[in-house]
Amino acid sequence: MHRREVHVVIGAGVAGCLSAITRSRAGYQVVVLERESARSAGTYPVCTQTSNIVSENHSGAEYPFDPRSARDCLDGRIENERFFPELIYGGKTYSRIIASRSMMDDGHDIVGQCRANMRVIQSHYADRRAQDPADAVFGDPADICREIPTVPGVHDVAAAFLTPQRGMNPVLVSTVLDWELRSAGVDFREGSTVTSVTHRADGRYEVAYRGADGTPETVVADQVSLCAATAAFGMAKRLNPSIVFPKLFLALREILYVDLPDGTDKNFTCLKLEDSYGGMLSPLNNACAMIYHPPAAHIMNLVMDPETCAFPDEYVHYLAEGHPEKEKRAEWTLDRLREFYPELRRSTILGTYLKVAINTVSDSRVRRNMGVFDVRPGCTMSVLPKWTMCAVNARKEVTLALEHSVASGRLSADEARELAGHAMRPCLETLPAWAGDPQSITARAAAHAVNMNVPQVLAQRFAPPHAESASSRGTV
């Protein structure tokens, strides 16, 4: 690189963290501006918003009504398998996708839908494997999906399906990202509220922000990455008024953490389909779980203003002050899921969280990747409709950054190709000492739980699962 470029990444959710890590690995000088401040000493405040209640690395199996959603999620799952370490799963194994008996009894062939979707997943994985042998991360295509008649300890099951889908622990994800940010030498500026991003006549960008002490600051960047979730759309629109986004639906949802006083025999997520017939039980360890029941969780769904791309005032209020139905909906969720999952019989609610899910359709059963937006030369925007797509989008984003450097004469095309591969090398490729010490892992994860405002019990893990053979996932 003829001159080391300065890149500013706005936002430190999972998209922003991956943008910063991959850009820094590619040789750029990276500054992260994150609004939140750490509450635990020696940590960065990463994944403190929506990412604090994401616990599933989707394979597409939960979207049996939309093959494109299934393929998008599987693409993400493959990339994540190559990028993230085993540590993020906290001892969890493959999720169970459960077709509800009551849904079948009411005339909805959810089992048939799931079987058809398994074929979509197998076919797409076979195509990916044929295109690039490095994508064969789950073995033979015939072995990645399996139907089983039931899931012990779950009620109202018509059939269940094992796929590469796998639950992960959000505080362990933050622990890994924090380490990688530091290892990459990222300049992380917490407590920084961005006030404006302007494009300069020389092609660079001026980013104005208020520092942690309230002092106005500016940084001039060669390139900018907009990763501040829903706020990124408005930033992009101001930088490029002619940019066109798809129609965007913003769904306000409620997710719960609960305790498990009786423990659980499930070191895997149960995703019971569909809508009023089901819900998610995602144990993070033997002591707590994340739960979700769609009718109770889905509070509102608004369309983003296509002209201003402003975040709805109602959501600003609810996220800051809470929703008036928050407690009622939480009890509704717990009461309903007790009918399916006996380990919730004596559970109590540890925390109730509101999040905004972004989608390009109003139907939550469809979740397609929006990709990375090329806002203008040297400025990208990455917003995730699904956590699973984070590494796919990070690869695309760092590729666009390198292409801009080539176009600007700062890199050769050969250099860019080499740096792109280096940028996407696996996390924890060289295992640090703390990652081999269970107590150190727990301590680091607990510190991030404080930052993320989630129960510290999340820092506990299941015992490591036994290695699963291909036959344990294979088609019956």
Where are these regions (language model features)?
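Active-site lid/adjacent beta-loop-alpha segment flanking the redox-cofactor pocket in flavoenzymes
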Residues: 268-366
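C-terminal catalytic lobe of FAD-dependent flavoproteins
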Residues: 158, 329-429
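N-terminal Rossmann-like FAD-binding beta1-loop-alpha1 element of flavoenzymes
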Residues: 5-31
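Glycine-rich FAD pyrophosphate-binding loop
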Residues: 25-50
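Dinucleotide-binding Rossmann-like beta1-alpha1 core, especially the glycine-rich loop
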Residues: 52-147
